[in-house]
Amino acid sequence: MSIRPLHDRVIVKRKEVETKSAGGIVLTGSAAAKSTRGEIIAVGKGRILENGTVQPLDVKVGDIVIFNDGYGVKSEKIDNEEVLIMSESDILAIVEA
């Protein structure tokens, strides 16, 4: 897959998580809530500040992040794979191992 986000945008591949009900039944597909964790697969060059300089992003390719799956997040299918395009400001945290 070859995609290059612009400015402060990032491309995230959602990480699917196994979800169990209170009774121990594994929920999959539409019965399970979508994960708000993902892996950064591409990053833009950075945010353009008012003075014209570019501020690099805090996230990098390979980071596992927790994101806000809200209004500004765009879902797109590229090479038969679903990815999310979002601004860095939609990322809430970087998961550190």
Swiss-Prot record:
Subunit structure: Heptamer of 7 subunits arranged in a ring. Interacts with the chaperonin GroEL.
Name of the protein described by the UniProt record: Co-chaperonin GroES
Gene giving rise to this polypeptide: groES
Annotated compartments: Cytoplasm
GO biological process, one term: chaperone cofactor-dependent protein refolding
Pfam families reported in the protein's UniProt record: Cpn10
Family the UniProt entry places it in: Belongs to the GroES chaperonin family.
Entry keywords, A to Z: Chaperone, Cytoplasm
Gene3D superfamilies registered for this protein in UniProt: GroES chaperonin
SMART domains in the record: Cpn10
One Gene Ontology cellular component annotation held by this UniProt entry: cytoplasm
Species per Swiss-Prot/TrEMBL record: Klebsiella pneumoniae (strain 342)
GO molecular function: ATP binding; metal ion binding; protein folding chaperone; protein-folding chaperone binding; unfolded protein binding
Function summary: Together with the chaperonin GroEL, plays an essential role in assisting protein folding. The GroEL-GroES system forms a nano-cage that allows encapsulation of the non-native substrate proteins and provides a physical environment optimized to promote and accelerate protein folding. GroES binds to the apical surface of the GroEL ring, thereby capping the opening of the GroEL channel.
PROSITE patterns: CHAPERONINS_CPN10
